């Protein structure tokens, strides 16, 4: 029920949670109908309260006032509702003039969040925030206070707002929290967060202190050190990959408690073995008709066999590391399977010792079958470890080859893009080099004149900075001028000491010479790092560098970063960035390669603001999609590993049964019958899993973020799993496809397609002069040739068809300088071309309209009066007259 009066309008000010909760006696807890009665008492009768009701505060003043006309109407309506026994409801609309006064203060953010803290907020602002539909509520109690008379003074106005018509509502915190969680749950990973109110990249700044999450931290905590990959000049390095193929954590030997215990037992058992062989009394001692020293050797192998096998593994690893080719290709897998190999050697030593110490003679003397079963158990354990070793090696080899063949090119391009963004957002290197030479010349001048200067620290003569991709800052290290920048992933303090990847090494890598360690490090840079920019000034301290580094985590921040880069690189007042501007930040080869990244820059040799903005935004999208792809692939590999573990465990169990002799004919008959039942129940599921694995790892037709077309519907890949793939349709509806079903469907991938064509068709009249059509064709070709950043030159334009004898269809097939992954950009360029074609047709006076048709009348009826029942009689009379 909306309150409105043509004679007089009253202001209804509603305050939510705005009153002190200490005065509980001021709240009305009884039926809301009785509130409208002229009750003189300030305390409400009764004290029971209902959790599902609205609690409205009464007027603080006990002085009764004459209700105004709107209040009388409300009173009459509520009394009628009470008499009829119907449910009472109050409708307050957003267009009520009582709720649209300018005197109402704005709504605070705390009130909208649904918290129960005392916050003053009007209902008017809640309408603006989209909560107007929550105003209409049907409850058992609704209590309103009469309106307040108009006041002239400011004090009266303040008192009127604070003490008169105030509504205290209990906020539903759990409902709003549930809505927020549902919104976060259904949000796509490929969609940006809401654009911040203030255009500042605050979300990308990392605080000075606190624990850093490796997935979100923006910097490497330790600067470059002389023993990193970029510490020496390229000419001085005989093996550029010698220090990078082996992680620092594997070089350090970890000493655990078990190793210490093994060393202690090794010393004690060797001492007891020497005593049993030297002392005559112990030399003749036997246990179960077996010499004492044999038992000691058996215990030594059981307890200290892992220690001895670890020595053998370390010796093998040392020989692998000494060979360059083996180190690049084999070392990663050697470190991955060194534990299973160590267990194999240990069990092999135990089996050899058991076989040669407890020979057939001892077995005949003891007349027991226990030794035979112990031997079989040892053989079973050794076979199980060997099979597990083969399984681990195969999974690692297949996963490494899959990542290397599928994602290496994208990772290399993404890291170079990140390097370009960070370098262009920092200070010019040529200026740093000139400043360093100036400082060095000044130092030499002072030394010549005889002044003794204190040794310069790293801050006095700084070396050219090292760019750490993902770290978000330029790192300074005490190396010489001309050193190649270093790329490393962002990580926590625990992972911050990991060495980086030099940019020149990155450019020389390919799928043939990259090692598995290097590929794993590149993947970590993508998965745990983010695009970042640098402010123009580089500070000396690490904390100041941390505050200056800014990460790009949304397309909005990417646009801000592009604007900062343009202001940093372009000359003051210039509208474009030229090759000379790039040369101030990058080398000549890097500048040429960077120019090729921009659309149309290789032809016109300049970059506009819009082109730079689109490039940074596309780089952010590509980086986000690649990181999500690698994460999903890692999850899929882990799940595949678990599936293979189950299958291998079943195979090992069957082999154990065969070795132990348990698998008799009757046993196999029972197992086969049960196996048939299992195949009947789970056969289809196993087939589906196998087809899904083949689809994900062998076919692999798309990655996360790719635009695909399946059954005529264009969709974006949202998430990839072992069994299913989640797509986003054009209206952001999530569609889940089983991978086994996708394997049987043709899939069109726009992202992996080359530059794609477009088709434009339009009609002209057949009577259009040929001169106009020729001029139209030439002007269209001229327009396309001038748009070098959008279209390939010389598109095909032909007269394709003729519709009767009235019009001619002209078809045009221009080729974009991109594929249709970004469908919005495709239609923008197509729309601009259509607008140009329409403008050219108007200029050339080319129109399509039907000419008048000639109608030939062969005969007319005789000139006799026409009599018809459908014509009024008065018309016939007028004709006869």
Curated annotation (Swiss-Prot):
<feature type="compositionally biased region" description="Polar residues">
    <location>
        <begin position="463"/>
        <end position="478"/>
    </location>
</feature>
<feature type="region of interest" description="Disordered">
    <location>
        <begin position="35"/>
        <end position="245"/>
    </location>
</feature>
<comment type="similarity">
    <text>Belongs to the MscS (TC 1.A.23) family.</text>
</comment>
<feature type="transmembrane region" description="Helical">
    <location>
        <begin position="678"/>
        <end position="698"/>
    </location>
</feature>
<dbReference type="InterPro" id="IPR010920">
    <property type="entry name" value="LSM_dom_sf"/>
</dbReference>
<feature type="compositionally biased region" description="Basic and acidic residues">
    <location>
        <begin position="492"/>
        <end position="501"/>
    </location>
</feature>
<feature type="transmembrane region" description="Helical">
    <location>
        <begin position="255"/>
        <end position="275"/>
    </location>
</feature>
<comment type="function">
    <text>Mechanosensitive channel that opens in response to stretch forces in the membrane lipid bilayer.</text>
</comment>
<feature type="transmembrane region" description="Helical">
    <location>
        <begin position="297"/>
        <end position="317"/>
    </location>
</feature>
<dbReference type="GO" id="GO:0034220">
    <property type="term" value="P:monoatomic ion transmembrane transport"/>
</dbReference>
<feature type="compositionally biased region" description="Polar residues">
    <location>
        <begin position="206"/>
        <end position="230"/>
    </location>
</feature>
<dbReference type="GO" id="GO:0005886">
    <property type="term" value="C:plasma membrane"/>
</dbReference>
<dbReference type="InterPro" id="IPR023408">
    <property type="entry name" value="MscS_beta-dom_sf"/>
</dbReference>
<feature type="region of interest" description="Disordered">
    <location>
        <begin position="457"/>
        <end position="501"/>
    </location>
</feature>
<keyword id="KW-0407">Ion channel</keyword>
<feature type="transmembrane region" description="Helical">
    <location>
        <begin position="339"/>
        <end position="359"/>
    </location>
</feature>
<feature type="transmembrane region" description="Helical">
    <location>
        <begin position="643"/>
        <end position="663"/>
    </location>
</feature>
<keyword id="KW-0812">Transmembrane</keyword>
<dbReference type="Pfam" id="PF00924">
    <property type="entry name" value="MS_channel_2nd"/>
</dbReference>
<feature type="compositionally biased region" description="Acidic residues">
    <location>
        <begin position="234"/>
        <end position="245"/>
    </location>
</feature>
<feature type="compositionally biased region" description="Polar residues">
    <location>
        <begin position="100"/>
        <end position="118"/>
    </location>
</feature>
<feature type="transmembrane region" description="Helical">
    <location>
        <begin position="377"/>
        <end position="397"/>
    </location>
</feature>
<keyword id="KW-0472">Membrane</keyword>
<keyword id="KW-0813">Transport</keyword>
<dbReference type="InterPro" id="IPR006685">
    <property type="entry name" value="MscS_channel_2nd"/>
</dbReference>
<dbReference type="InterPro" id="IPR016688">
    <property type="entry name" value="MscS-like_plants/fungi"/>
</dbReference>
<keyword id="KW-0406">Ion transport</keyword>
<protein>
    <recommendedName>
        <fullName>Mechanosensitive ion channel protein 4</fullName>
    </recommendedName>
</protein>
<feature type="compositionally biased region" description="Polar residues">
    <location>
        <begin position="73"/>
        <end position="82"/>
    </location>
</feature>
<feature type="compositionally biased region" description="Basic and acidic residues">
    <location>
        <begin position="56"/>
        <end position="66"/>
    </location>
</feature>
<keyword id="KW-1133">Transmembrane helix</keyword>
């Amino acid at each position: 029920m909306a309150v409105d009066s043509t004679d007089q309008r009253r202001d209804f000010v509603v305050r939510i949670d705005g009153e002190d909760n200490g005065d509980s006696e001021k709240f009305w807890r009884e039926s809301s109908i009785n509130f409208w009665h002229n009750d003189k008492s300030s305390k409400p009768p009764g004290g029971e309260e209902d959790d599902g009701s609205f609690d409205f505060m009464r007027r603080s003043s006990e002085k009764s006032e004459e209700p105004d006309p709107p209040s009388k109407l409300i009173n009459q309506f509520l009394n009628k509702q009470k008499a009829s026994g119907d449910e009472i409801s109050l409708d307050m609309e957003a267009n009520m003039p009582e709720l649209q006064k300018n005197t109402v203060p704005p709504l605070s953010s705390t009130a909208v969040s649904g918290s129960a803290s005392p916050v003053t907020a009007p209902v008017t602002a809640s309408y603006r925030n989209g909560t107007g539909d929550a105003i209409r509520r049907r409850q058992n109690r609704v209590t309103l206070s009469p309106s307040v008379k108009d006041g002239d003074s400011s004090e009266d106005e303040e008192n009127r707002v604070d003490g008169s018509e105030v509504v205290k509502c209990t906020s539903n915190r759990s409902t709003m929290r549930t809505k927020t969680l549902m919104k976060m749950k259904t949000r796509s990973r490929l969609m940006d967060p809401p654009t911040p109110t203030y255009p500042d990249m605050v979300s990308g700044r990392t605080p000075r202190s606190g624990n850093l999450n490796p997935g979100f931290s923006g910097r490497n905590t330790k600067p470059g050190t002389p023993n990193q990959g970029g510490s020496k000049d390229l000419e001085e390095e005989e093996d550029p990959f010698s220090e990078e193929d082996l992680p620092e954590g594997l070089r350090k030997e970890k000493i655990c408690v078990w190793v210490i215990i093994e060393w202690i037992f090794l010393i004690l058992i060797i001492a007891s073995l020497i005593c049993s062989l030297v002392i005559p009394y112990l030399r003749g001692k036997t246990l179960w008709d077996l010499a004492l020293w044999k038992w000691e050797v058996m215990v030594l192998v059981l307890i200290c066999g892992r220690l001895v096998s670890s020595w053998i593994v370390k010796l093998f690893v040392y020989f692998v590391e000494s060979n360059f080719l083996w180190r690049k290709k084999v070392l990663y897998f050697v470190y991955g399977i060194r534990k299973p190999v160590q267990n194999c050697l240990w069990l092999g030593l135990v089996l050899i010792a058991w076989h040669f110490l407890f020979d057939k003679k001892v077995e005949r003397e003891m007349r027991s079958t226990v030794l035979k079963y112990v031997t079989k158990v040892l053989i079973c354990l050794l076979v199980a470890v060997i099979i597990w070793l083969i399984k681990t090696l195969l999974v690692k080899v297949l996963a490494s080859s899959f990542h290397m063949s599928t994602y290496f090119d994208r990772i290399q391009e993404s890291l170079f893009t990140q390097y370009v963004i960070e370098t262009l957002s920092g200070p010019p290197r040529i200026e740093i080099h000139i400043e360093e030479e100036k400082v060095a010349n000044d130092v030499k001048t002072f030394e010549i004149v005889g002044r003794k200067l204190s040794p310069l620290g790293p801050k006095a003569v700084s070396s050219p900075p090292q760019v750490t991709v993902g770290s978000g800052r330029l790192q300074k290290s005490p190396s010489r001028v001309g050193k190649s920048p270093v790329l490393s992933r962002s990580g926590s303090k625990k992972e911050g000491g990991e060495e980086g990847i030099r940019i020149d090494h990155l450019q020389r890598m390919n799928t043939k010479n990259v090692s598995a360690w290097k590929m794993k490090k590149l993947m970590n840079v993508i998965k745990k790092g983010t695009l970042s920019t640098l402010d123009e000034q580089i500070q000396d301290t690490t904390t100041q560098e941390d505050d200056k580094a800014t990460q790009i985590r949304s397309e909005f921040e990417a646009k801000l970063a592009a604007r900062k880069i343009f202001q940093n690189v372009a000359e003051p007042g210039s509208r474009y960035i030229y090759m000379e501007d790039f040369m101030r930040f990058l080398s000549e080869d890097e500048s040429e390669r960077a120019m090729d990244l921009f659309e149309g820059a290789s032809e016109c040799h300049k970059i506009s603001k819009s082109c730079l903005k689109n490039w940074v935004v596309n780089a952010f999208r590509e980086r986000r999609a690649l990181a999500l792809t690698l994460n999903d692939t890692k999850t899929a590999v882990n799940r595949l590993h678990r599936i293979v573990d189950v299958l291998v465990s079943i195979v090992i169990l069957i082999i154990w049964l065969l070795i132990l002799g348990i698998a008799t004919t009757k046993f196999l008959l029972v197992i086969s019958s049960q196996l048939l039942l299992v195949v009947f129940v789970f056969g289809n599921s196993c087939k589906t899993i196998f087809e899904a694995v083949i689809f994900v790892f062998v076919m692999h037709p798309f990655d996360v973020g790719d635009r695909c077309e399946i059954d005529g519907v264009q969709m974006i890949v949202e998430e990839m799993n072992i069994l299913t793939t989640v797509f986003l349709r054009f209206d952001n509806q999530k569609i889940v496809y089983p991978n086994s079903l996708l394997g049987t469907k043709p899939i069109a991938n726009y992202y992996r397609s080359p530059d794609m064509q477009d088709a434009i068709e339009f009609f002209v009249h057949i009577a259009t002069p040929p001169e106009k059509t020729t001029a139209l064709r030439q002007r269209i070709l001229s327009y396309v040739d001038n748009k070098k950043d959008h279209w390939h030159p010389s598109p095909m334009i032909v007269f394709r068809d003729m519709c009767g004898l009235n019009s001619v269809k002209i078809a045009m097939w221009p080729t974009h300088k991109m594929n249709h992954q970004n469908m919005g950009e495709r239609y923008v360029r197509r729309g601009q071309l259509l607008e140009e074609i329409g403008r050219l047709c108007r200029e050339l006076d080319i129109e399509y309209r039907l000419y008048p048709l000639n109608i030939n009348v062969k005969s007319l009826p005789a000139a006799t009066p026409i009599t018809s029942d459908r014509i009024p009689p008065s018309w016939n009379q007028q004709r006869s007259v």
